[in-house]
Amino acid sequence: MEKAIKKYFPVFALPTLVAFTIGFIVPFIMGIYLSFCEFTTVTDAKFVGLKNYLRVFSDPTFMHALWFTALFTIVSVLTINVFAFVIAMLLTKGIKGTNFFRTVFFMPNLIGGIVLGYIWQILLNGILGHFGRTLTYSSSYGFWGLIILMNWQQVGYMMIIYIASIQNIPGELIEAAKMDGASDWQLLKSVTIPMVMPSITICTFLTLTNSFKLFDQNLALTAGEPSNNSQMLALNIFETFYGRTGWEGVGQAKAVIFFIIVAVIALAQNRLTRTKEVQQ
């Protein structure tokens, strides 16, 4: 059986490989090449070297979007994972209605980002309207609006991952710790957290990448207003590419830089948390 699988593996893998090459590899390579070109369409691309990259770092809107995105990512990763872990701990204590609460917390994750953005825009503007403010009055309003939206959407999904991990902790291990006189805090710090570190790695990776590449919620909630001060990187790239004639190459260069930043941060985070797993 194993020999037959090895024999026909290339036949079954080839369609997937071809689709992956056409749908990802070729566009990715073309995107890198176009980041060194001036163009309005891919057929009139003119190579200009590093000019586009120099224009990227001289563009104040990009640098502001980078710092805004970095701050948003830090806050959202921390809040989402803390809330998700706390809720998961509560829902694994055997309280009544656990399945109902799991469903309720998970449901927002099923709603599309653009829809969520408009829903929360209406809700938050309705609340702020009582104080003569809107989400676009200040970038800080937009920032915390995005944090609330992202938490509401993502906490339920991360909660499910944490619940599965907590339920897999051997009961004998917890009982042994209690018999040794471990307090609730010691039990959490020395048993629960080390045992769920693989889930912490996964959830941190997912929230980090989702936060950094956030686009549709940003577009729907604030559209970068006021004056692009609540604009995140993905939206900045979109508006550079499609909203500024002659800047298509710069937009592509921004996209390449964006990819590198996300890849480096995600790999570093993944390696760091996996190291913690080994140490534990």
Where are these regions (language model features)?
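A structural signal for multi-pass alpha-helical bundles of membrane permease subunits
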Residues: 2-280
